[in-house]
């Protein structure tokens, strides 16, 4: 029987104590900083990371600017327009794809303008350190279907003030230039899939103030909160269809001055 040969916890602990000691780790890591290949990498002696404005891989993201020790009050959302109207089961990969991207999309055009050869585009996953690339890829998965731009595939929407069908990124820039708040309308199980930070970061950088859905995946909901995007849920029995929302509405969300970040953390929903 296995129980006859299986060692006791005491025997295992005695074996570990007699064979493993702190000197093993001290010896192994004593010269960890003495690596010629690592030392040969050019660097500047500084306690802060020297951001390179010419880098196409690592850039200082705008959401790190102006961070305060204490959270600021939640801004009101007035006269917002919908950037997307989505169905059920929108995954984090729909929101922030990790694969390759085309040369004629917003991300590809950005890199070409920066002098990057098409063969060196790599993927969204490899360029997660560049917010300029990642926000241009948000909601750009070819499998996403935005009901505000019927008949299109991928990252397109209708710029509602003019009716122009354009990329989600370009539309977001126009809304931001006009000072228009943005929301996303969604169905159930919004944000399922892998835990992907950029699904929340990219949403914020597009100017989205709130995502209004039937239900949220718990982890993605918490990441939206962490980035300052409000995850708002329809009341039980209500959704886009029952309220007859077609996405063209102008939306104002009242009472946000009474909401604190503790309220947002206290209520968790699962799909």
Where are these regions (language model features)?
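Mobile "lid/hinge" segments at catalytic clefts and subdomain interfaces of large enzymes
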Residues: 1-26
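A glycine-rich phosphate-binding loop feature that marks nucleotide/adenosyl-phosphate handling sites
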Residues: 1-6, 30-38, 134
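Non-catalytic terminal/interface segments that mediate subunit docking, oligomerization
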Residues: 42-212
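Acidic, glycine-rich active-site loops and adjacent beta-strand->loop/helix elements
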Residues: 188-191, 216-220, 237-238
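Short hydrophobic alpha-helical runs that function as membrane-insertion/retention elements
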Residues: 209-214, 231-234
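Active-site-proximal loop->helix
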Residues: 218-231
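Active-site-proximal mixed secondary-structure blocks
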Residues: 232-259
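Conserved small/polar residues in nucleotide/adenosyl-binding loops
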Residues: 262-269
